[in-house]
């Protein structure tokens, strides 16, 4: 039932020129409500397609009061970051400074829990964030217009990161 919707996700939105916003069609709103009732949601994945994913705070809401500090911290960091997709279509969807904050959060987690059961997942996410932060992405280069001049927002994010996390 969701195959067409996921393959053609962007076609389930109408563009409203008056407020310059994309509004979901009634069919999508109905499906969104059904998914939300069981802890899932749709997310735009790029290239007109969508995916179904757990709601960002799903695990945190259910388990945080009942689990170890290691799992609690993992769930809380994940919930805080999963609300806003970091990368899509080879481009950074968040500010470089926010990307630095995400890196610091996961580095702090690994320092606090060096033998974490979640180490592989954390390290994978951390490596992707570090790559985007230090090397850039196809559609979010670090340098201005192919020059050797570092983009102003990247330079500021790097300086702020070094200042806050020496």
Task: Give the role of each language-model region.
Residues 16, 20-26, 30-31, 58-100, ...:
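Short coil/linker segments at helix-helix boundaries
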Residues 65-69, 109-121, 161-166:
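Short solvent-exposed coil/turn linkers within tandem alpha-helical repeat scaffolds
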Residues 1-48:
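N-terminal Sec/ER secretory leader and immediately downstream segment
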Residues 2-8, 114-119, 123:
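Short, charge-rich amphipathic alpha-helical segments embedded
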Residues 119-124, 148-152:
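Short, charged, amphipathic alpha-helical segments
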């Amino acid at each position: 039932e969701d195959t067409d919707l996921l393959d053609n996700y962007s076609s389930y939105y109408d563009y409203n020129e008056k407020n310059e916003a994309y509004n979901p069609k009634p069919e999508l709103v109905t499906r969104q409500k059904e998914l939300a009732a069981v802890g899932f949601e749709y997310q735009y994945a790029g290239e007109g397609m969508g995916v179904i994913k757990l709601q960002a705070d799903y695990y945190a809401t259910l388990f945080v009061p009942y689990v170890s500090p290691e799992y609690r911290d993992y769930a809380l960091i994940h919930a805080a970051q999963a609300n806003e997709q970091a990368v899509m279509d080879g481009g950074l969807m968040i500010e470089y400074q926010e990307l630095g904050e995400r890196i610091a959060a996961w580095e702090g987690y690994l320092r606090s829990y060096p033998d974490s059961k979640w180490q592989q997942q954390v390290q994978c996410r951390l490596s992707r964030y570090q790559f985007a932060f230090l090397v850039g992405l196809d559609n979010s280069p670090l340098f201005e217009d192919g020059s050797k001049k570092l983009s102003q927002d990247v330079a500021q994010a790097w300086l702020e990161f070094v200042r806050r996390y020496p």
